[in-house]
Amino acid sequence: MLFGALQDIQASRIRAAERQVDELLRHYPNFRLGHLIKGDLLLAHARPLSVMGDGVRSAGPRIDELRAEALQRAKRASEPPPPGALPWEVWQLSANERHLLVVDTSSSRLFVFENLAGKLERVADYYVSIGRLGAGKTREGDQKTPVGIYHTAGSISPARLTDFYGSGAFPLNYPNEWDRRQARSGHGIWLHGTPRDTYSRPPFASDGCVVLANRELEDLASRLDGASVPVIIAPKIDWVLPEQSASRAAGFHRALESWRVDWESRDTERYLRHYASEFQTQGKDLAAWREHKLNVNALKTFIRVGITNLSVFQYPGNQDLAVVTFDQEYQSDRLANQMRKEQYWRQVDGVWQIIYEGPAAAPRTAVAMSQGSIIKVAAKSSRKSPKIRRS
């Protein structure tokens, strides 16, 4: 309705634009941008409009923010993503993960992808607000939204939050392993809603969180089937066809399979060639990892490693960094176990090597939305009252 009204205004169809805006405000009476456009349309009966907010006596930063919101919303409608295209960062989503969220901070959009029979389909997208000073968080309090690969970590119902957060919140696991490597600080980055008297916020308005309109947060929650949903936050999405993604990922997949085969070989030096000099894991550097692997492999007569449910994402803004998660089934004559593993791989001179590996976070909470409230099915460890922070 909003984009249709803007098109009507551009074509000088004032009456048609009024009908669309009236319908919009009937559904969303707290939509401030809609009220601004309504005022402009009333003024247009007396004289031509020059800019949005022409009828406001004293234009200021608030009107500029509403103009910026209108521009971002109109751009999405006039420049939609190509049909069937995927974000540049998406190489593979695990078969057991139903959804993927991708935030394009430059266009103020959150895109929802659903895994349908092994094919990723874009099923929804929403306008969002990000940090007051943009994207690329580096330190606590810098009012920026982080750029990276994260996942939702549970949910917080509106009953446990102030009205500022609207219909609830989905915390993200910022800082991730790469953030910590870069000495980035801060915490409490959430996807959350808006106060009840506010339909949406300007494009740059939070302290770093990603903020959605309440109705759209509720729609998002109704789609998600678990709390551990991958979230990619990118400075700008470049859209590519799935076959282009598969071609770009082929070299990485060969490196991953070579790592698995070399681990099974029990040739520790061959296996260690897949680890970079800056490798770290759970307090061990490469030298300590080498000593550990030499000791444990010497005691084994066979090793078998299975990899399933693989997800691979290229890091936003860094074509030489990939984040991988998978279910690992390990068997030897002395040990058998299963785990969800996360690895960070870095490419140097065309060679992919591991700079971090460790256990991946397991889902803790299932979420659903009913009549404007997030319903939680939570582990006991997640029942403590959250520390309230504003963003």
Predicted regions and their residues:
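Short, well-ordered alpha-helical segments enriched in acidic and aromatic residues
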Residues: S265-E278, Q282
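Short beta-strand edge/turn micro-motifs at domain boundaries
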Residues: A336-I375, R383, K387
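Exported/periplasmic cell-wall-interacting domains
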Residues: G154-E257
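Alpha-helical segment of the N-proximal tetratricopeptide repeat
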Residues: M1-E23, H27, R254-S265
